[in-house]
Amino acid sequence: MKGTKKIFIICCVFLAIIIIGDSCQKFSVLNTNPNNVTPDQASPDYLMAGVLANSAMWYGNLGSGVISGAMQQTYQDAWGSTFSDYEWDQQGFDWTGNYHILANDKLLLQKAQGYQWNFHQGVALVMRGFGFANIADFWGDAPDSMALNGSLTGTNNQYPPFDSQESIYENAIADFKAAIPYFSGSMADHPEITPITQSSDVFYGGDPVKWKKLAYSLLLRYYLRLSSKMDEQANVESVAANVFQSIDDDWMMPFPGQDQGSSYQFCEKFNDASGYHRNKMCGTLTMKLKDLKDPRIVIMAQPIATPSVVDASQFAIGDNTTLTTIVNGIRYINPAAAAANNYKQFDPATYTTDRPYGALRNTIMNLYDTSSVYVGIPISYDNYVDFEYNINGSGVQSTSLSNYVSYLRTDIYDNPSGPLLAQRLASYSEICFDLAEAAQKGWNVGGTAATWYNKGIKASFDTWQVFGSYQSDVDNYYGCVKDYNTYIGQPSVAYDGTLQRIMEQKWIASWQACNEAYMDWRRTGLPALTIGWGSYRGQIPLRFGYNNSELSNNPANAQIAIDKLVPSTYNNTDGNNSSWSKFWLLQGTNKPW
C-alpha cells in the first residue's frame, strides 16, 4: 500500500511538472495553459517537484544508459557505438537541460527564502550543489558563480566565465553543509511541510530527517571524490556517523510509468521494440557474476532462449559446412564447421586478440559462447556485427533479436515501472563501500573495512530482493550460491584487505546506477576493465566534451577552460576539448590510465 501511494504521488508530481515546466525556455508557454500559472506565481512546492523529478530523470537515465555501457554492465548492439564502443564526442552531450533545472532551483530557493520556509531552502541548496557538482563531474570547468543571470545586463551575466572544477566542488560542498541546519528536527517541527509538500517531494515525502542524512552522504561522496587531490581524512571522519543508515534511506524515485518521459527508458511500451532488445547484458559483468557465483545475475539478466553446446556427434562425419542444428531446444555447434568458417569459442583471457579488427576485418574470427544460460556480449565486439554475436544468424540489424544473448531480465526491465524499477541517485550500499574504502585507508569511520564491505554487499542483496522475492529463482539457477553467508565466505568474495576487492563489489552493486562506479573508476582505475578491440580510441573516455552550442554562444570563456585540459595519447585529432583529455580532478594523479 505504501509503494502504491508513492507511485500515485509521483504521477501527480509529473502532472505538476507539465504545468510548471522544466526549463526557462518552457516558461514562455505557460501563458497558454488554462491555469494561467507563471513562474513567479508558482508555488515552491510545485517548483520543487519539477527540480527533483527532472534531476532524477537526467541522472538516472545516464546511470542506466551510456554510463552503464562505459562501465561494461550493459551493451547496446546495432548502432550503439556511443554506448559500447565509447564513440563519445561533444555533439552528444549538452548541459543545457542541467542549467534549466538549476534555473528552476534558483527560483525555488528565492521563493523559499521569501517565505522563510526552511525545508524548501534546504532542498534547494542540496539540489543546487548536486546539479553543479554533476556538471563538474562530467564536463569539468563550467559556469557556476555567474551562471543563471541571463535576465541581467552585463557581459559576465550574458557570457558567464567558467569557474574552475575545483571551485565548483567547493561551492557544492558549501551548499550541502549550508542545507543541513534547515533540516533540523522532524516533520512536526516544520509547519511549512504540508500535504502538498509531501506529495511534491518525490524522494522522501517531505521527511527532513532523511534529507539531512542525504546532505551528509553527499558530503561523504564528494570528500572521497576529492581525496586523490587533497587530504580529506578529517572531513570524511566528521560526517561518517550521520550518513545513510539503511536501504530505507536510499535516494531514489520510482517510475510512474505513465508515458515515455516518466518510464524506464528501455521498456517497449512507449518505445520501439528494438530499443529494449538492443539493450543487452555486457560480457564483462556476466563473466564476473558467473565467476563469483553471484545470485544477483538472476535479477539482472534474462536466460538465453536457446542454450548452446559444442558436440560433433550431432553432425555427420566429415561435415564441415553445417554450423549448427537445434534438437529438443538445444542448439548444437559443429566444431569442424566452426573452425572452417572462422568461428572460435569465446575465451575471456584471449578474446581481444582472437578477433582482429580494422584492416584485418576480412579475416576476423567470430566468437561463440556456450558457458552458461547467461551470455553477455564482449565489450566493443564490433558495432557492425555485434547483433550477430554467438552465431545469432538473424541477419537483421534493426531488430537486434537474439535467442543466444541475454537481454536484461524481461519481467523486470521490459516494463515502464515496477517494484525494482527506480531512478537511483545514491544508496546505502554505496555509502557502506565508501566507508569501507575510508577504513581501508586507516581512517576512523566507526567500523572496519571488512564490516563496511560486508554491509555494502548485504545492502545490495536487500535492495534487489535477491534472497526475498527472488529466492526461488536463485534456488533454481545452478550457477550461484543460495545465501548471503555462503557468498561472502567464498575466497573470491571475502574481504582481502585490498581496495580492488571493495571497488569490484561496489561496481557490481551499482547496477542500473553506474554514475558513481564511473567516478570511482576514473579516480582509482578500479575495477580494471579490459577494452575491446572495437573501441573508438582504445580507452574508456574521461569526460564529456563541451558542446558546440556552448562553443558558439560563449566561445572566449569556453576556450579558457579548454586550454586548461591536458590532452592524452587517445585524443587523436580532437584537440584539447576531447573526451580523453584530463581535467583538474585527474591531472597529476596517474589515474585511471
Question: Model-derived features: where do they sit?
Answer:
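Bacterial Sec-dependent N-terminal signal peptides
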Residues: 1-32
